[in-house]
Amino acid sequence: YEIPDEELEDIFTRFKKLADEKKTITSSDLEALTLHRSKISRPEESTAPTCKLISHSITSGSDIPKISYVKLSRDNNIMEGVEYGAGPLDAAFKAVNKMLGVEARLEDFSVRAVTEGEDSIGEAVVKISSAASGEMYTGSGISTDIVEASLQAYISGINKMFEAGE
């Protein structure tokens, strides 16, 4: 199995971030990073702009408003958005939709641990639908931070919408 240089560089960047977050990196962690990256790689011929999560922050609690700050890049343009929602993910997804000017609706959502331990890597999978066409798109993301994994998954689904010409 060969990994293209650009993909290997992305895997290494994600590995360094993971090493900063965890005390011990396991072979399962490395497998999750590698397999997930190859699963979400974009076709070389695609010309659709790719959105990428740069950073995020949430405020959430039982007696306070749920607020999400999201910073994205698209076509080398940096965008920032802040939104309120019923929960931190609702707020985050609203911020992404507003920044990108899309009407995507969350249809299905799941999170699972793909490695062991309290600091395990979580994988989020979302199914979103386009309000314009009704088409469904699936996205996935991984991180030790499940909010980050969820945002990666949502953005992955939106990137697929863009690739389909929406």
Set out the residue ranges of the language-model regions:
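Terminal or standalone catalytic/regulatory effector modules within metabolic enzymes
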Residues: Y1-E166
